[in-house]
């Protein structure tokens, strides 16, 4: 099946939030299932120095009264084919923000739609967040292209209808209130990035005033949990670490902790309880909770805290003041550094995610992968990925609290600090987290099923010989006929012509004429 991703980010070249990780890591897992997956994204100015891009475009087009060019290149690590929409409006170094943000991404969405119609026509056009929200509206006219829309963060909803009226030809009744609403209405399939978040956004508390619409489309809404690239994030082979380690041998973490303390200007103490946080510094991430409890926690325990990230100026100022009150015990780096983030995951004892809401979260998965025990709030994808630690049952991978409240958060931190005093059980807790399977292979199977549903394709079944053998009782499981597990076969690629003529076609005339074109 031909699948075209349309997104504003792709890790590692352009990454602001979790969407970049998804767009950069999911396509290889889908390719392993037999899909031909490609990506179209804005041609930001910074990409020309980070990728090998030919001087000549593969296609020139026009939309919204403006000409653009499309350049073809490859992902630097996984070889994914990437199409870049080239136009001077994407030249600045910034990704988001600016007075022209709404126009820029509406223009990109329109260019992506034109490319899909005229150059590389996919069976499924997979759109990510509000930047591509108008694509399902335009593609609704084309019965040969199905659309899937992924909600990465419902809080960011795109330009409102009065702006869209001036930028697109779509009448007002096709747009909803904003691009997010338009995508939810017209996409053939919609998914959130975790099962719990897909349920939460149908309630008034987390819906950002879209609960009515989300309940209306609940029949096509599902939650598919994000994953991580286990090869790119592997503590046993990570070259950014001073010492590698694995679940079977955790000795290297002590060296990483020492280097982290030295680099961040903390007292070098192997017995100190070191808390790490790598995050955008915004209200969503619960940084204000940390500011409320940090002084008391530092007064009564031997805790150290390291924070890496950028964001809201008020929160940055609060963190700086906290660091100045506790020299040698609190360190704050207001930047983003990939190597330093890996060192924080590999050297910290616990990882903080006290989020107000969390669609899925990638950081807690990376933390567990590197043996860093997460302390999280029970919300969104954190519920699906961090089962609470139960010392009596020797189960769970982290510490959880319910209410977005400093008392609850402080209690969870004290519980984790007390557990850290018992090193034998703490190491078992670390190992359980490191052995969790949050690879993209599991998520890719669910996306594959979703693609088949929106295209009207049936699930692949066993061949006739296997069914006959099973019916005669020769083997209890046809896949074990030779005494071995048969490797799953990838689905055959379906052309657009096959889709229009197949029994599951979205074209109602196919049933009337028996799949024959008249």
Swiss-Prot record:
Catalytic reaction list: [(1->4)-alpha-D-glucosyl](n) + ADP-alpha-D-glucose = [(1->4)-alpha-D-glucosyl](n+1) + ADP + H(+)
GO BP field: glycogen biosynthetic process
Binding, ADP-alpha-D-glucose: 15
SUPFAM superfamilies named in the record: UDP-Glycosyltransferase/glycogen phosphorylase
Listed pathway(s): Glycan biosynthesis; glycogen biosynthesis
GO molecular function, one term: alpha-1,4-glucan glucosyltransferase (UDP-glucose donor) activity
CDD domains: GT5_Glycogen_synthase_DULL1-like
Keyword annotations from UniProtKB, A to Z: Glycogen biosynthesis, Glycosyltransferase, Transferase
Gene3D superfamilies assigned: Glycogen Phosphorylase B
Enzyme class label: transferase
InterPro entries referenced in this protein's UniProt entry, alphabetically: Glyco_trans_1, GS/SS, Starch_synth_cat_dom
Stretches for region Disordered: 469-518
EC numbers on record: 2.4.1.21
Family: Belongs to the glycosyltransferase 1 family. Bacterial/plant glycogen synthase subfamily.
Primary role: Synthesizes alpha-1,4-glucan chains using ADP-glucose.
UniProt-recorded name of the protein: Glycogen synthase
Organism expressing this protein natively: Synechococcus sp. (strain CC9311)
Organism lineage string: Bacteria, Bacillati, Cyanobacteriota, Cyanophyceae, Synechococcales
Gene: glgA
